[in-house]
Amino acid sequence: MAQPVRSDLRYSADHEWLSAQTPARVGVSAVAADALGEVVFVELPEAGAAVEAGEPCGELESTKSVSDLVSPVTGTVVAVNGAVVDEPGTINADPYGEGWLFAVDVDGEGELLSAQEYAERFDAEVVPA
């Protein structure tokens, strides 16, 4: 079954999503959450940390593997979702809502895909926001 991809978000080839709001929120796609399996530990950048597009800024550990969290943008982290640190499974349960990871003031963007481009590349299904 194809995983949902929200139409109002943009995506990196590393499976992170970026919202259009300011500051922008970052999370992992349902495609990534499904591939990871049950997320059991999350390491996020701290508020105030500088992140760089295409560079690791944290880790997601699941029952299957440990994966780098790669920032889709360059900027400064302004907020971290402590709820996913306390309850990492929220990423699997609601990757586009309560499972967001951090918010960032964007200085520059990496190579981002539209929802349609991401869905075509990773065999997913675009759904309305």
Which role fits each region the language model picked out?
Residues 61-70, 87-89:
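Short, Lys/Arg- and Gly-enriched loop/turn segments at beta-strand edges
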Residues 72, 86, 113:
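Charged, alpha-helix-enriched surfaces in structured cytosolic catalytic cores
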Residues 1-56, 89, 93, 97-129:
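Acidic, low-complexity mobile loops and tails
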Residues 18, 63, 80-83:
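Residue-level recognition of beta-strand microenvironments
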Residues 74, 78-79, 85, 92:
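Charged, amphipathic alpha-helical coiled-coil/dimerization segments
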Residues 23, 71-74:
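ATP/adenylate-binding site constellation spanning eukaryotic-like Ser/Thr protein kinases
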